[in-house]
């Protein structure tokens, strides 16, 4: 059985007078990009420019919606209701879809950002609302979600195309979630170790957790 591995990166995080990241260089090495939608990062001009660059370099475009938390880069927990989560999705995906339409680019996928991503992995009513919002904007858009999570299983149940995501540079807990950034073992900094972990995840469907257990 053959596998297609998509190399993916978050992009479009600059805004106003602030330049973050090296987007044009990164685009030479990835096959898809998650474009910030203006709340945790990005702005309308950056969103448009990023879509154009992705088209020029043949990189698939995905939406990267987050919490309305520019100061915290969307990584802080927020008390969000299902209605709010659904509206957040429609608002941000709708904006990026508009730029994709302008340049005749397919909006291939959606990947949540930061605390929004983490919440949807473990909170069923938020995950349901996220998928409701996705389907309201474009039912053909794939859901890029944490492999084995609730939202991954619910998306598959609904018939939404799913991209099972694994991380090369992040640690995993025994529950299959990401180790919080504030805790030891959250990041894999050695390139060789990251490569070996990716190969295990892709070839064997397993990962070594922060406790040393293989799941």
Model-identified regions with their sequence ranges:
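Hydrophobic faces of well-ordered beta-strands that scaffold small-molecule active sites
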Residues: 5-9, 33-35, 61-65, 108-112, ...
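Active-site beta-loop-alpha junctions enriched in small/polar residues
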Residues: 10-14, 36-40, 66-70, 113-117, ...
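Glycine-rich tight-turn/loop motif centered on a GG-T
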Residues: 19, 23, 33-40, 71-86, ...
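Acidic (Asp/Glu)-rich catalytic clusters
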Residues: 24-28, 49-62, 101-104
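Glycine/small-residue-rich loop that forms an oxyanion/phosphate-binding "nest" at active or ligand-binding sites
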Residues: 69-109
């Amino acid at each position: 059985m053959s596998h297609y591995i998509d190399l993916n990166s978050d992009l479009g995080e600059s805004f106003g007078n602030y330049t973050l990241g090296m987007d044009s260089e990164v685009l030479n090495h990835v096959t898809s990009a998650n474009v910030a939608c203006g709340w945790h990062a990005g702005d309308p001009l950056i969103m448009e420019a990023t879509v154009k660059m992705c088209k020029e370099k043949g990189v698939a475009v995905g939406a990267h919606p987050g919490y309305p938390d520019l100061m915290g880069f969307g990584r802080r927990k927020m008390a969000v209701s299902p209605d709010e989560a659904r509206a957040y999705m429609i608002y941000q995906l709708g904006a990026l879809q508009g730029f994709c339409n302008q340049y005749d680019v397919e909006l291939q996928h959606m990947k949540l950002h930061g605390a929004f991503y983490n919440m949807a992995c473990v909170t069923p009513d938020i995950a349901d609302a996220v998928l409701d919002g996705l389907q309201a904007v474009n039912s053909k858009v794939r859901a890029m979600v944490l492999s084995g999570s609730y939202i991954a299983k619910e998306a598959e149940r609904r018939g939404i195309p799913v991209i099972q995501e694994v991380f090369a540079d992040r640690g995993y807990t025994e529950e299959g979630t990401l180790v919080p950034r504030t805790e030891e073992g959250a990041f894999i900094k050695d390139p060789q170790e990251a490569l070996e972990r990716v190969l295990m995840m892709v070839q064997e469907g397993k990962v070594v957790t922060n406790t040393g257990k293989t799941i």
